[in-house]
Amino acid sequence: MKRFLLCSFALVLLYPAGIDMYLVGLPRIAADLNASEAQLHIAFSVYLAGMATAMLFAGKIADQSGRKPVAIVGALVFMMASLLCSRASEGSLFLSGRFLQGVGAGGCYVVAFAILRDTLDEHRRAKVLSLLNGITCIVPVLAPVVGHLIMLRFPWQSLFYTMSAMGIIVGLLSLFILRETRPARLAPRDLSRSSPAAESLVNRFFVSRLAITTLSVSVILTFVNASPVLLMEVMGFSRGDYAITMALTAGVSMVVSFSTPFALGLFKPRTLMLVSQGLFLTAGVTLSLAHTNTVTLFGLTLICAGFSVGFGVAMSQALGPFSLRAGVASSTLGIAQVCGSSLWIWLAAILGISAMNMLIGILIGCSIVSILLIFSVAPNRSVAEHEEIPYQSRS
């Protein structure tokens, strides 16, 4: 079991590392490529577009050919794309590399969740996904620090050499440590129950959890996207104050994420999901009524706590009905989360909604819709029946 957890954690970490590692070198990258920082900020959107593109195909391929081949290819693509970025001499080549980085990270991301669905029952999976969320929260804090230390002695290209090395490590883990977990053939009496046709992506329960997780990701990405404006322009924080504040909010996320597995031993998953949405609603009301920086910071802290306590549980429930189509389900969740959050941020920008109102709107909207879905669509018996699925154990 340890090998599956190690490989899943490593596969997921490529995604946030690809976002955060290079940001500290953005001014130098822009200068060397004769591009403005504003032009290169599109690299974030290009990276997400690459992830979404990979997710369209990676899940289905993983269900048909296995998790291991997709993990190896994804890590290889991430490694080569990182080298392409390091060799870029102009903006378009750099953006091409960023797109391919997203493709590699997206494939690995999908496989990681499929592996956890294959190897863990719902109770353990919810705990592991909460821990995974906490570990992921470390990356946005550590990656810029590591990038800064690297750039004290080396050029910006070294940031992408580092990411390339990460791709190599993940590829080696996938090649030599990871074992295939794609479900083995089922007994004839189980085929009708667990066939791809029965594991529909349009069943009410999956759609409800897809909506909840997509709205939750929209909340946290809106917070990340709006935080520079809120903290430095509206609240008057310096760059140093901003970095400290974001580190503290990431610390809150880690503490809550690492505490959630223990909470699952005391409370039902539904209770934690309701607590999560209650925290979102409280954060939205707090921010709308805040007149001091202290109250605003309290509201922002509630956002991080709310996301950390409920997201892993909701993701675990979303994957629960799927045994033979875990890859496709994971892909669908990833695409919805990336595209849904990007659409909200884009629409808010087009409509001229302020950063604070953008955040308040998604907080209140997410909490109300999610609470209604939690009460109206509960896990049914068939979800539990899909949990115990034998998997292949081939190296």
Curated annotation (Swiss-Prot):
Has the keyword Cell membrane been applied to this entry?
yes
User: What's its membrane topology?
Assistant: Multi-pass membrane protein
Q: Which residues cross the membrane?
A: 4-24, 42-62, 69-89, 93-113, 131-151, 158-178, 217-237, 247-267, 271-291, 295-315, 333-353, 358-378
**Pfam families noted in UniProt:** MFS_1
A GO molecular function assigned to this protein is: transmembrane transporter activity
The answer, when asked if Acetylation is one of the entry's keywords, is no
Gene3D superfamilies with a match to the protein in the record: Multidrug resistance protein D
**Which is one Gene Ontology cellular component term of this protein?**
plasma membrane
Q: What keywords is this UniProt entry annotated with?
A: Cell inner membrane, Cell membrane, Membrane, Transmembrane, Transmembrane helix, Transport
Location comes to: Cell inner membrane
| InterPro entries (alphabetical) | MFS, MFS_dom, MFS_trans_sf, Multidrug-R_MdtL
Q: What NCBIfam families does the record tag this protein with?
A: PRK10473.1
Instruction: Tell me which HAMAP family the record gives.
Output: MFS_MdtL (MF_01530)
Q: What family, per the record? A: Belongs to the major facilitator superfamily. DHA1 family. MdtL (TC 2.A.1.2.22) subfamily.
Specify the protein name.
Multidrug resistance protein MdtL
- Give the originating organism: Salmonella agona (strain SL483)
